[in-house]
Structures are given as structure tokens and as C-alpha cells.
Design a protein with these regions (language model features):
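Conserved alpha/beta core of the MobA/IspD/sugar-nucleotide pyrophosphorylase nucleotidyltransferase superfamily
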Residues: 138-211
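N-terminal glycine-rich phosphate-binding loop and ensuing alpha1 helix
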Residues: 1-39
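Short, flexible, basic/aromatic active-site loop/helix in glycosyltransferases
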Residues: 121-146
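Conserved beta-loop-beta/alpha segment of the NTase-like Rossmann-fold superfamily
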Residues: 53, 62-124, 141
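Residues at the starts of beta-strands that form the adenosine-phosphate
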Residues: 28-30, 108, 178
Length: 211
């Protein structure tokens, strides 16, 4: 089962993610991108009730392909597009607002937090090659926001040169364009491991006490 459909305090992780977007009042419409085998299940869950989810579509082989599918599903008169990992349910309204504001001004904005751990470069045999200077290093999160036309240009260039980035910010960098950073949060957890669910329940109790 995809991680975003795993239960957190009895509800899918995605429930809390969408709840924050819905209640923020900042999003006009949302395109949900899911694995093909989860398409009908997701449509039944999220399109039967009035929400900002307007379409549920299938993803691609890689993250970049999935985001591109979502991009194509949006109307051409879209101003700002926001990309978010469904398994980050603890984003805040302030993060959404700030990424939108910065993207509107500069074209591209990503949420991130400074690296505070020691970072080692390690070879394929597990041998440490060197210790990296963490000054100026940030751990990137989502949401990430972009002007619609700029992200489209970035996708076209990436496809032309078979470039794959690990996030959409990398596609903008590949254009030679500026990407601005918005403060993220340690609470903006990406739930990918069983132990993340335990931590997520603790965060959930603080952010969604009614859950």
C-alpha cells in the first residue's frame, strides 16, 4: 500500500495533508496524483465529497513524471502551482502562504531547514571519503511553489535533455533561474518508515487534537 494511504490515528495520512490545504483557504483546486492501482480507491475517497480536490490522476515512473502529469492536468491560466508530498501531513498554513508569496515575487520557492548534523560522503563499500562542510547546506522539504509558466519551461528543457532532478527546484536550477528558500520545520515530517508513524502520532496529537 502506498505510504500516503497508511493509517495515522485511524485515518489515512493523506487525510491530514488535504485537511490543511482545504482549511488554509489559499488553494483554488488540487490535483491528486496516485499510483494507477490506487486510482479508483482514491477517486472514491476524495471526489465523492466537496473538497478542493478536483482531479485524481495516475502518476509516472518517477517523481518528476508524476509531477509533470499533475502539471498538465491544471488549466493553462494557473498562476502559481504548489507541489507537495502527500506523506508530509504536518505542513502549516504559514508555509503554504509564504511559498506562494515568494514564488509570486521571484518565480520559485522551496521549503527547507538548515542541516545540523555532521554530513559524511561515503563510498559504495561503506568507507568514509570525507566530511562535508555543512555551512550553507539545507534539507529540502515540500511544499514547493512555482510560477506556472516557469515550471512549464523547466519541464520542457528537462525533457529535451533527459534531465531528472530529485525535486522541482532542481529543474528551475537547471534553467539557470533563481530559487528562494522558505523556512520549513522539523515537524514537517515525511513519513516513509514505520518509526515515522510513531513520531507522527505524537505530532498529530499536538496539531490535530480533535483527531
Amino acid at each position: 500500500m502506498p505510504k500516503q494511504f497508511l493509517a495515522l490515528m485511524g485515518k489515512p495520512i493523506l487525510h491530514y495533508t488535504l485537511k490543511t490545504f482545504q482549511e488554509s483557504g489559499l488553494i483554488d483546486s488540487l490535483v491528486l496524483v496516485v499510483p494507477e492501482k490506487e486510482l479508483e480507491h482514491a477517486r472514491a475517497d476524495w471526489l465523492e465529497h466537496p473538497t478542493i480536490v478536483k482531479q485524481v490522476i495516475t502518476g509516472g515512473k518517477q517523481r518528476q513524471d508524476s509531477v509533470f502529469n499533475g502539471y498538465q492536468a491544471l488549466p493553462a491560466d494557473t498562476d502559481i502551482i504548489l507541489v507537495h508530498d502527500g506523506v508530509r501531513p504536518f505542513l502549516s498554513k504559514d508555509m503554504i502562504q509564504e511559498t506562494i508569496n515568494i514564488a509570486a515575487e521571484f518565480g520559485a520557492a522551496i521549503t527547507a531547514i538548515p542541516v545540523n548534523d555532521t554530513i559524511k560522503q561515503v563510498d559504495s563499500f561503506g568507507k568514509v571519503e570525507r566530511t562535508l562542510d555543512r555551512e550553507g547546506l539545507w534539507r529540502v522539504q515540500t511544499p514547493q511553489a512555482f510560477r506556472y509558466d516557469l515550471l512549464g519551461e523547466a519541464f520542457r528543457k528537462a525533457q529535451k535533455h533527459s534531465f531528472y532532478g530529485t525535486d522541482e527546484g532542481a529543474l528551475i536550477e537547471n534553467l539557470g533561474q533563481e530559487v528562494r528558500v522558505v523556512d520549513g520545520s522539523e515537524w514537517n515530517l515525511k513519513i516513509t518508515r514505520p518509526e515515522d508513524l510513531v513520531l507522527g502520532e505524537s505530532i498529530l496529537a499536538k496539531l490535530f487534537p480533535e483527531a
